[in-house]
Design a protein with these regions (language model features):
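Glycine-rich beta-to-alpha active-site loop
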Residues: 97-141, 163-164, 168-173
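Gly/Pro- and small hydrophobic-enriched strand-loop and loop-to-helix capping segments
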Residues: 123-146, 180-195
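Amphipathic alpha-helical blocks and their helix-capping loop/short-beta junctions
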Residues: 187-218
Length: 218
């Protein structure tokens, strides 16, 4: 499956499992993510959600390279109505993450671009590593910074958001924190341990999960 979801302890865990495509989001993946998040939003036993992307080397290393451009190009050139479904449902997913009402912890290791920003920027704990490569490259393919970019890029200090939007430039984890596009830094080799601990700790409530994660930032 391209989206792996399980509940361990009091936390719902999502792994994007399409490493060959750097976890680019297909329509099926968007639908899987919507389904599981709506389910967990209603489930009182799930206090928080954590999400990561499988990389070629293992459980972390590539968060999400964005929307599946190959699919979008093919759908667009053949008049496939699924292209509209993709954007409509992807944007609904982005909005859901912003309004989830529970801590949403994004392990933004490796590539975090375009649609990958859309499924992380609405989170309450946006964690970057020394391997993070972040960008909103939509203008390069003649689109605009979508997936909520108008919201999160406008909240960068000064004119940084405008610069990121117009150039599509890639920034690292430290710059992401400075630009208000990430909340904390974690060395990549520490992620697996924290991910495991999220599923074994006892938490009083969602706020306690959020507090635990923030205590792990370097």
């Amino acid at each position: 499956a391209e989206v792996l979801a399980e509940v361990r302890g009091q936390v719902g865990f999502i792994t994007l499992n399409r490493a060959k495509a750097l976890n680019a989001l297909s329509l099926g993946m968007v639908r899987d993510l919507l389904d599981v998040l709506l389910q967990w939003q209603k489930d009182e036993k799930v206090l928080a959600v954590a999400i990561r992307g499988n990389g070629k080397e293992g459980a972390f290393g590539a968060f999400c390279a964005g929307g599946d451009i190959r699919f979008l190009h093919k759908a667009g050139s053949t008049g496939n109505p699924e292209i509209e479904d993709f954007f409509t449902e992807e944007y609904a997913l982005n909005h859901l993450i912003h309004t989830l009402g529970k801590p949403y912890i994004a392990f933004m290791d490796g590539i975090v671009m375009g649609g990958g920003m859309g499924i992380s920027q609405g989170g309450t704990a946006r964690i970057v590593t020394e391997r993070t490569k972040m960008a909103m490259p939509e203008t390069i393919i003649g689109l605009f910074p979508d997936v909520g970019g108008g919201y999160f890029l406008s909240r960068c200090p000064g004119r940084v958001g405008e610069w990121l939007a117009l150039t599509g430039d890639t920034i690292n984890g430290a710059s992401a924190i400075a630009a208000n596009l990430a909340d904390g830094f974690m060395p990549s080799d520490k992620q697996a341990g924290v991910w495991e601990q999220l599923g074994t700790e006892k938490f009083a409530d969602g706020a306690a999960v959020q507090k635990f994660i923030e205590s792990q930032y370097v």
